[in-house]
Amino acid sequence: MDKHTLVILLHGFTSRPKDLGYVERAIKAVIDRVEVLKPPLLLSRLSIANPGVIVSHLLQLVDKRWETGRYDRIILAGHSAGALLARKLYIAACGNHRFAPLEKELATSCGSARPWAAYVERLVLLAGMNNGWSIDYHMSLGRALQYSVGVIFAQLGYLLTRRWPTILQIRRGAPFLTELRVEWLLMRRDAGIKGVGSALVVQLLGTVDDLVSPRDNMDLVTGSDFFFLDVPDSGHGSVLQMDDSTRGQNRAVVLQNALTWSKETLAIKSAPIEEVNPVLVREDVDEVVFVIHGIRDEGFWTDKIAREIVMEGRAVGRTFARETSTYGYFGMFPFLSPWARRKKVEWLMNKYAEAIARYPQATKFHYVGHSNGTYLLARALRNYRCCHFSRVVFAGSVVPSRYDWDSHLRSVPPRVEDILNYVATADWVVAFFPNCFEYLGIPDIGGAGHRGFTQLDSGGSDSAQPRNIRYVVGQHSAAIRESNWKALANFVVHGYPADGIPSGAATGKDHEFFVGLLALCPPLIWLALLAILASVPALLFLGYSHYHWHEWLVTSLLIAYVSSIGYIGNRI
């Protein structure tokens, strides 16, 4: 007897259920006793809907249909952004995970697995945006311009509404997208224990798709139940055009194969995974350490510290992998932009998700951050529920001194197990600039590299050891000098030493006098700098008005001056 099948078919961004008409026809042509559910989704161009809310509504919809339908199997399918929602729907149906809790819109109703989760046979992703979207060289010029303009308007809209448009919530590195990736990996890892979460996944991707790359499937290819099928002569949108033309029928055949082929047949006839995405998966890695550089820095030193940590771990029989990727040179002016800082946080969390995929047996992640590298983790811990690190080292921190570490240290399970924050004697970079933001009550960045963290002082946390290391002699990079590498490695591998302060660098008793004095009122430094910067335009105006300098000369000098300031601000 034929199985009674329910297919949940989800449209993509700016699309509507009726745009899936050809897809529905192709499904019904090869599956008997099938019901195709095509719900309308809040994915219009101007939508500001939370994707978690969309998935919550889908859960309720499937729950009701399951109660009345008596289905023998379920197939989840989606196009583009709809494929992301199909994956999230499956994750939510399989229940919450303690290390990657679902968002509040889903957590209250997803403590345990849904009864129908075990009946999900496969997911079929049509041009699924498994790694989100980003503007890069793969895009056509027209699409890149369209997305660039859209991002500008979306950011302006956020300033007015304080809500991100839906399209920006599924970009590469965004919280919803990254958390989905981590939730998926943990769900697949625990599928054998929970009895749900192991459905087949088939990705269909057009051969001329300029929005989704075959290499965007890292999270999926690390499992044995993922298969990849090329759709000939198809782009990101035209993959749905399964009309009566030759190309349309070829597309329909690929979809029908994805729906009906057995796992064994898919393994034979799908594209070889190592060619689609040559991911080097290492099952031997026990722990992973991130070593991330900061502003005004290319990060060449990160490999050296990471190597010291790997060697220390090897000496005690533990295998460490290292993540020392660079996000490029990041000058002072870009650092002052919250938009630029947010992009770097998204970069970090993209690397975090990739590391979970690449090292599936790793049980602990550690972090060593300097300058902006400290901000990246602090912000990631606030924005991403799936972010967990065991031991954390901050040097030259640009995080506010009142940052809430207790909530991370005391959460269950802990988001952070232990942390060291090195405070330097003469870190004028932090004392004069990020510290000024904290002095003025502006959140997000601050002077912990100069002040220390309030909650990490003795008595301010559960640890008997001081987590603020006061004071390392030197300036902004004092704690990452070679003399301190061994101490950093010892802490990451072994934890806080019982016999002393974990520092190989020279230590002092207080800040250097002038740094400490000027840091008492850092806005004075800014006012002095602004006065100096304003003096040149003032002199030019004086020359024009009193000494009758030529207008073209004054204009040229002013343009050259502003350009120089911009260049210097991006390099220092």
Locate the predicted segments by residue:
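Canonical alpha-helical transmembrane segments of integral membrane proteins
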Residues: 522-542
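Membrane-helix interfacial anchor on the cytosolic side
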Residues: 563-572
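Helical cap/lid subdomain of alpha/beta-hydrolase-fold lipid enzymes
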Residues: 90-272, 382-383, 391-522
